[in-house]
Amino acid sequence: MAKDIKFREDARARLEQGVNKLADTLKVTLGPKGRNVVLDKKFGSPQITNDGVTIARDIDLEDNYENMGAQLVKEVATQTNDVAGDGTTTATILAQAMVNEGIKNVTAGANPMIIRKGIQKAVDRAVEELQKNAVSVEDKESISQVASISANDEEVGKLIAEAMEKVGKDGVITVEESKSFKTDLNVVEGMQFDRGYVSPYMVTDNEKMEAHLEEPYILITDKKIGNIQEILPVLEKIVEQGKEVLLIAEDIEGEALATLVVNKLRGTFTCVGVKAPGFGDRRKAMLEDIAVLTGGQVISEDVGLELKNADISMLGRARQVTITKDDTTIVDGYGNEEDIQKRITQLRTQIEETTSDFDREKLEERLAKLAGGVAVVEVGAATETEMKEKKLRIEDALNSTRAAVEEGIVAGGGTALIDVLPSLEEVQADGDESTGVSIVRRALEEPVRQLAHNSGAEGSIVAEQVKQKGTNIGFNALENDYTNMLDAGVVDPKKVTRSALENAGSIAAMFLTTEAVVADLPDEDDNDDGDMGGGAPGMGGMGGMPGM
C-alpha cells in the first residue's frame, strides 16, 4: 500500500489537531460541574457517560494524521486507567497542554531533544514533591471522600467505604447490575465459591432451599466419589461424634450419592456434597486454598493419599457453612493463621509475577477469599443507559479508592499540581532544558483552569489565586470558593495524580521529538466504483427487452 509522508512543522501540526480534538471532547467532563458526552452505538441506545477512558476508546478520526495524534493521547488515558484506574481526563489535559506549549517552542527553533530532558527533569521533581505532600488514608471517612469525589456521588462514596471496611483493602469488591432501582451493598463473609449442593434432598432449610451446617467436618478431595465404601470409615467416626459433614469432591454419584441422601432423609446424619470449584490446575489450587482455610488436607493421589485411608485428622473444620443450589460459603474456617498468611503471601507473589490479565484476576479473587471475603455493589437505575453510566462511575470510584489506600491522597481539584510549582524553581536546567521545565510548569496549571472553566469561572484568574494561597488551599468547584481541600474532603489519590503526570510527560516528549509522520494513502479501490457505473449504460440493451 502506498504511503504519504509529512515532515517537521506540517507533521506536528496535523498530529496536534488530533490531540486537540480528542482532548477537547474529554475536557468538558472534568470536575463536579463537568458535562456528559453521548456516544453513538451501532447496536442499542446511545451511551451517555463522563468517564474519560470510555470516551477516548470510542474516538477514531477520519483523517489519518489527526487520528494518529488522537491515538497517542488515547494511550495516555488508557495507560493511566490501567495503572491507577482513574484520572484519565486529567492525564489527557496535561498531555494536551504540554504538546501545545512544546510545539510552539519547537516551531520557534528550540531543540526538541533538549526540551525532552527538561520535561523529564520537571516531571521527576514534581512527582517527588507530590510524594512529600501525600497523606496516608486510614479511616473510613477518608475512603468515603475519595470515592465520593471520583463518582461525584456521596452515597456511592459511603457504599464503597462500607464495603472496604467489611472486606478489608485486599478483599474483592465487585460491581454488578441490580434488578431493582436501588443501589445496594451485599457482603459475603468468608470464602464463597460457585458450586452448590449435588442434590436438593440435602437441604436443611426447605423454605429457602439452603443447607446450613454448624461446625461441620469438611472432606476435600479431587477424586469422584462413587463407592460409599471408600468414605464409610471416616463417615462412621464423624457420626459417632454427632457432627455434620461437607464433602467437596470432583463429583458425587451413583451408590455414594443415594446412600448419603437416604441417610439424610432418615435423619441418621447430615451430609451435604458439593462439586469442587474451578477446572484443571486452578481446581487443585482452589481446593488447596479451602484446605488451608479450614485446617484440612486435600486427599489426592498427587500427594499419595487415598479416600479409603482418609482419617478424621485430615478433615477441615469451619464455624458455619451455607450451601445454596449455586454457591457454597465457608465462614470462619479453623485453619492455622500462620498457614493462611503464608498462602496469602504466596498468592501475592504470583499476582506480581503473572503477565496474564485473566490469571491475575483469578488470583486476586482467590486472595480476597482467603484474606477477607467478597463485597458486591449492586447498581440500580431506572433505565439501562443510566445504569451503565452509573456503573462506570462506581468502578472508577472503586479504582480511585484502592489507589488512595495504596499511595495516599493529595489535595484535589488540581490543587496538588499547583502546589508543586515552587519546587520546579529548584530544577537545575538552562537553555532549551529550562524551556522543557517551563512547559511542565504551564501544563500543571491546566487542570485547575479547566475545572474553573467547567464551573463557569475564569480559569486564568482562579489559577493565579490558587498559586498565591497556601499549600492545599484550592478552588472548590462545587461551592465556587477557595478552601483547604483536605479539610473539605476534596481529595485525589496520589497514585492517580502521579500516573497522569508521568504518562502525559512521556507522550509529550515523544510528540515533540517527532520529525516525520507516515500514513496510508486512501485505497485506490474507492475510485473503482465510477468505472462500474460507466459500464451500466452498456446494459441498456436490456431496455430493448420489450422489443424482443
From Swiss-Prot:
Please provide, in alphabetical order, the Gene Ontology terms of the cellular component aspect for this entry.
cytoplasm
Composition skew (Gly residues), residue ranges: 532-548
Give this protein's Gene Ontology molecular function annotations: ATP binding; ATP-dependent protein folding chaperone; isomerase activity; unfolded protein binding
List, alphabetically, the PROSITE patterns matched.
Answer: CHAPERONINS_CPN60
Q: Where does this one sit in the cell? A: Cytoplasm
Q: Where is the composition biased (Acidic residues)?
A: 522-531
Positions of the UniProt region annotated as Disordered: 522-548
Its Enzyme Commission number? 5.6.1.7
Provide the alphabetized UniProt keywords: ATP-binding, Chaperone, Cytoplasm, Isomerase, Nucleotide-binding
InterPro entries xrefs? Chaperonin_Cpn60_CS (IPR018370), Cpn60/GroEL (IPR001844), Cpn60/GroEL/TCP-1 (IPR002423), GroEL-like_apical_dom_sf (IPR027409), GROEL-like_equatorial_sf (IPR027413), TCP-1-like_intermed_sf (IPR027410)
Self-association state and partner proteins as the record states: Forms a cylinder of 14 subunits composed of two heptameric rings stacked back-to-back. Interacts with the co-chaperonin GroES.
Q: Which HAMAP family does this UniProt record tie to the protein?
A: CH60
Q: Which PANTHER family match?
A: 60 KDA HEAT SHOCK PROTEIN, MITOCHONDRIAL (PTHR45633)
- Say what the protein does: Together with its co-chaperonin GroES, plays an essential role in assisting protein folding. The GroEL-GroES system forms a nano-cage that allows encapsulation of the non-native substrate proteins and provides a physical environment optimized to promote and accelerate protein folding.
Name of the protein: Chaperonin GroEL
